[in-house]
Each structure stands twice: as structure tokens, then as C-alpha cells.
């Protein structure tokens, strides 16, 4: 203190120097050591909530919970655009996946005002609610369905058609595709049947080769069975695949156009040595029509197992080769023929349509205008009980128990068709029956599914 008083008295400037020296000698460390500095700069590990990925809870609460934040402010917290985007979708309008909307094991991805379901193989739809396998509703395919190696549905179409943009429907790829009615004046009310794909396993559905006999019958020789009673007049062009078979004197059977050069009919319609003329585009047999096309048959091929001397109606199917190709148009169009499995599937839809110029009542006159009739499929047990004659596995019954409606004499060889989404497929050949339209009796048809491979092999166009 004595020194300080003396200095202050003699030189005030020295006071300043003394104070500065005192301060410099004091412990006032400006920088922290490494350990303490690390504690201050330490950032807590991000917490994974399971819903918002990793985030710094404190910063997120401050930035986006206490106050409304922008996307960029949230981006500063996450320091990652992908994680920020996922958080942002929930932050803006809540978690759309909270209610677990995706079914059948589908994974939900949240979005703004929406969500997206990532479906397991075999399922599709907004919520993976649709079983897309072929065993359920035919995989939603309009014609044919198969599974690929990943168990996914692949739809396909019959010849003359291609898949539409939806990859489910089929659209014509040629001017006059098989099984389509293209005459413009025929109204939609004449669409003849509904497609009903049931929840059945359609894969590997071919039937066993079983003979269902009531009685061993060597030769069912009953010409009166050569099989539309109770039908309706068809409009011109409504059944453009239907043909009329003419002998040297009169018409005697029907048939269906397979392609420009071939017709399919019943084998029992073929008579050795009888010249056959096929008339396509026919409607009214009592007058010439501009839509008619006549072709001579140059070759008749019954199915190789057909033997009329043993049984006139077993394997009752034959092919007719024409001398000149038919000119396809709206009145002359082939019928579609699916593969074996699908032909059998279509038959099981339950209803088909038969057509022809046969007798309009039992032992009555033949029709001049093409007739058609909707007939229900009859289960095999009922069919067997209805007759004493043999019903083989390559036959089926269709018709009405109460009678009054049936195919009849002159209709033999004509088509039994099933309409599938506006396209008709051949499912049977009119073969035989006991009388016509009798109560408790049914029409018997050749089951085309048993012969499709043979038909396609023999009728290939070269």
C-alpha cells in the first residue's frame, strides 16, 4: 500500500501499468480443455420411435412440435432428405397407415392425404384385397389365366385377339375374330349368356377318362334321335359360325365353322358315298340370300375312335374339309375353340346355346328360319337316371326336365356354345336324345373338351 500511495502521488500513469500487470497475472483461462469442450459439443444419439425413423427429439420438439415448421427446418434436424420426406408425410396430415389398411400381408407406405400398399405375390388392388391367382375369379382375366414363375397372374387370349391395355381384357386383332357377333343391327339384348367365373381351381382341371354306363349297349341305332323345339328365331348374323349341311336332296345336319377351310359336325351325320355341300351365312332356307356361301366337302374325317357299327353316338364328332376357303365376314365367322381345360371350364358355367334348322316340334316340320335356344347343363347323376342308354364321359346332358324345349331332328352336328365376355366358345356338338323335348328327357351332346387337341391338329391352315 505504501508503494501504491507513493506511485499515485508521484505519477498517476504508473497506476494503470500496475493494474494491468495484476490482471495478466490472474488465472482467467479462455479455452476449455478437450474433455470439457467435448461435453459441451456432444450431440445426443437420435432416438428411433419406430414411426418417424431417427430424429433429435429435443430439436424436433422445438422446431416442429412447439411451432409450425417448414420442410427445410425439418431437413436441418434430419440432415437427410429421405428421412425428412417420410417424417413430413406424417407431420402434414397424420399417419395414413396407422389403421393398417393393407390386407393379406401387404406393406403400407404413408403419403400425403393417401397411402400405397405393396402387395404380396398373388394379391392386388388398392388394399391388396383381390386374390389375383387363377383359382379365384379366373385371376380377373377375361379369357385365359396362367401363373408365371413368380406366382403372378398372366392373362392371355384366344387366336385372333390380343390383350387390351388393362392386361385383363381381350380385344380383336383381326377384322372378323372368332366367336364375335359383328352385325351392327343386333342389339345388346341378344347377348346370350353371362360369364360366371366361380372360385374354382381351374388349373389342371382336366377330367379322368371314365365311362359312365347304365347299361352295356352295343349299338344305339335310333335314327329318330338324330337331333330346336321351343326356341326363338335368330336374327341374321346372330350365329355366324352356324352352317347347314346339304345332301343331294335335302338339308340334314348342322355344323360350325372352325376356320376358312374346316367345319366341325357330328360323325353320325357323315354317310358313305353321300355328297355334302356346306352352306355358310344361311338364315332362311326357303329363299336365296346374298350372305350365303356354298362349298363342297372334299374330305370327311371322323374321330379315330368313332365306330358306327359299335355305337353310332360314341365319339360323335367329325371334321369336314372344304374345297375352297370361306370368305370371312359378319355373316360367316369361325367359332372360338379354347384348350381342353378351359373348354371344360366354360361348359361348367351352366348355360349354353344351341342352334339349328331342325324340327320345331317332335316329328313335326323343320324350321326355315335359324332357331336358337338357351339350355342349362344337367348334372351327370340326373342325366344317368333319365335314360336306359349309355352316357359316356365324353358326353353331357343339357335341357329342361319339364320338357317343351330341346334340340331335335335336323339339328345334329350343330353347335353348343358358351359365351364368355361377348365371345362364344364351342363347348358341345348336338348328338342325340330320346324323342324331342319330352318331360324327364334331355339332349345329349358330344363334350368338345375331349377333342380340342385333335381338332386343332387336323385343321391347321398351311
Curated annotation (Swiss-Prot):
Coiled coil: none annotated. The gene is F9. It comes from Bos taurus (Bovine). The modification (3R)-3-hydroxyaspartate is found at residue 110. Belongs to the peptidase S1 family. Pfam families: EGF (PF00008), FXa_inhibition (PF14670), Gla (PF00594), Trypsin (PF00089). Its main location: secreted. The record marks 192-193, 227-228 as: Cleavage. The modification Sulfotyrosine is found at residue 202. Ca(2+) 7 binds at residues 93-94, 96, 110-111. This is Coagulation factor IX. Ca(2+) 3 binds at residues 54, 63, 73, 76. Disulfide bonds join 64-69, 97-108, 102-117, 119-128, 134-145, 141-155, 157-170, 178-336, 253-269, 383-397, 408-436. Detected in blood plasma (at protein level). PROSITE patterns: ASX_HYDROXYL, EGF_1, EGF_2, EGF_3, EGF_CA, GLA_1, GLA_2, TRYPSIN_DOM. Factor IX is a vitamin K-dependent plasma protein that participates in the intrinsic pathway of blood coagulation by converting factor X to its active form in the presence of Ca(2+) ions, phospholipids, and factor VIIIa. Heterodimer of a light chain and a heavy chain; disulfide-linked. Interacts (inactive and activated) with F11 (activated) in calcium-dependent manner. Interacts with SERPINC1. Interacts with the heterodimeric snake venom coagulation factor IX-binding protein. Activated by factor XIa, which excises the activation peptide. The propeptide can also be removed by snake venom protease. Activated by coagulation factor VIIa-tissue factor (F7-F3) complex in calcium-dependent manner. The iron and 2-oxoglutarate dependent 3-hydroxylation of aspartate and asparagine is (R) stereospecific within EGF domains. Residues 93-129, 130-171 form the EGF-like domain. It catalyses: Selective cleavage of Arg-|-Ile bond in factor X to form factor Xa. The lineage of its organism: Eukaryota, Metazoa, Chordata, Craniata, Vertebrata. The modification Phosphoserine is found at residues 114, 205. Residues 47-92 form the Gla domain. InterPro entries: Coagulation_fac-like_Gla_dom, EGF-like_Ca-bd_dom, EGF-like_dom, EGF-type_Asp/Asn_hydroxyl_site, EGF_Ca-bd_CS, GLA-like_dom_SF, GLA_domain, Pept_S1A_FX. Ca(2+) 6 binds at residues 82, 86. Residues 228-460 form the Peptidase S1 domain. The keyword Disulfide bond applies. Ca(2+) 5 binds at residues 72, 76. The active site is at residues 268, 316, 412.
Amino acid at each position: 500500500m505504501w508503494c501504491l500511495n507513493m506511485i499515485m502521488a508521484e505519477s498517476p500513469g504508473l497506476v494503470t501499468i500496475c493494474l494491468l500487470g495484476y490482471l495478466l497475472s490472474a488465472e482467467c483461462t479462455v479455452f476449455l480443455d478437450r474433455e470439457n469442450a467435448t461435453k459441451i459439443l456432444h450431440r445426443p444419439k437420435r432416438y428411433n420411435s419406430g414411426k418417424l425413423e431417427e430424429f433429435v427429439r429435443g430439436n424436433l420438439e422445438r422446431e416442429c412440435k412447439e411451432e409450425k415448421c417448414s420442410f427445410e427446418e425439418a431437413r436441418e434436424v434430419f440432415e437427410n432428405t429421405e428421412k425428412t420426406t417420410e417424417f413430413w408425410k406424417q407431420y402434414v396430415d397424420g399417419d395414413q397407415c396407422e389403421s393398417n389398411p393393407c390386407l393379406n400381408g401387404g406393406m403400407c407406405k404413408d403419403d400425403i392425404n393417401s397411402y400405397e400398399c405393396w402387395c404380396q405375390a398373388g394379391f392386388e388392388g388398392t388394399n391388396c384385397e383381390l386374390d389375383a391367382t387363377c383359382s379365384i375369379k379366373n385371376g380377373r382375366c377375361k379369357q385365359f389365366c396362367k401363373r408365371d414363375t413368380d406366382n403372378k397372374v398372366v392373362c392371355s387370349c384366344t387366336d385372333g385377339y390380343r390383350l387390351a391395355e388393362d392386361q385383363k381384357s381381350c380385344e380383336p386383332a383381326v377384322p372378323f375374330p372368332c366367336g364375335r357377333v359383328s352385325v351392327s343391327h343386333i342389339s345388346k339384348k341378344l347377348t346370350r349368356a353371362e360369364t360366371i367365373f366361380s372360385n374354382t381351381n381351374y388349373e389342371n382341371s382336366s377330367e379322368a377318362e371314365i365311362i359312365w354306363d347304365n347299361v352295356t349297349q352295343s349299338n344305339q341305332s335310333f335314327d329318330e334321335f338324330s337331333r330346336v323345339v321351343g326356341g326363338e328365331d335368330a336374327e341374321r348374323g346372330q350365329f355366324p359360325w352356324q352352317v347347314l349341311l346339304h345332301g343331294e336332296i335335302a338339308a340334314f345336319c348342322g355344323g360350325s365353322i372352325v376356320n376358312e377351310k374346316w367345319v366341325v359336325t357330328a360323325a353320325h351325320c357323315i354317310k358313305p358315298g353321300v355328297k355334302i355341300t356346306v352352306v355358310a351365312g344361311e338364315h332362311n332356307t326357303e329363299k336365296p340370300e346374298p350372305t350365303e356361301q356354298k362349298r363342297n366337302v372334299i374330305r370327311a374325317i371322323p374321330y379315330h375312335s368313332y365306330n358306327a357299327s359299335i355305337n353310332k353316338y360314341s365319339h360323335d364328332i367329325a371334321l369336314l374339309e372344304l374345297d375352297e376357303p370361306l370368305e370371312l365376314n359378319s355373316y360367316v365367322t369361325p367359332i372360338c375353340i379354347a384348350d381342353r381345360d378351359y373348354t371344360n371350364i366354360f361348359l361348367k358355367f351352366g348355360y349354353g346355346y344351341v342352334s339349328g334348322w331342325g324340327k320345331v316340334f317332335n316329328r313335326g316340320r323343320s324350321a326355315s328360319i335359324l332357331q336358337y335356344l338357351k339350355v342349362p347343363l344337367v348334372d351327370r347323376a340326373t342325366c344317368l337316371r333319365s335314360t336306359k342308354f349309355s352316357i359316356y364321359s365324353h358326353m353331357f346332358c343339357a335341357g329342361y326336365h319339364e320338357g317343351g324345349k330341346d334340340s331335335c331332328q335336323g339339328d345334329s352336328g350343330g353347335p353348343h356354345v358358351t359365351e364368355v365376355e361377348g365371345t362364344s366358345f364351342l363347348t358341345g356338338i348336338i348328338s342325340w336324345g330320346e324323342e324331342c323335348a319330352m318331360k324327364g328327357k334331355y339332349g345329349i351332346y358330344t363334350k368338345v373338351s375331349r377333342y380340342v387337341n385333335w381338332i386343332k391338329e387336323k385343321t391347321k391352315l398351311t
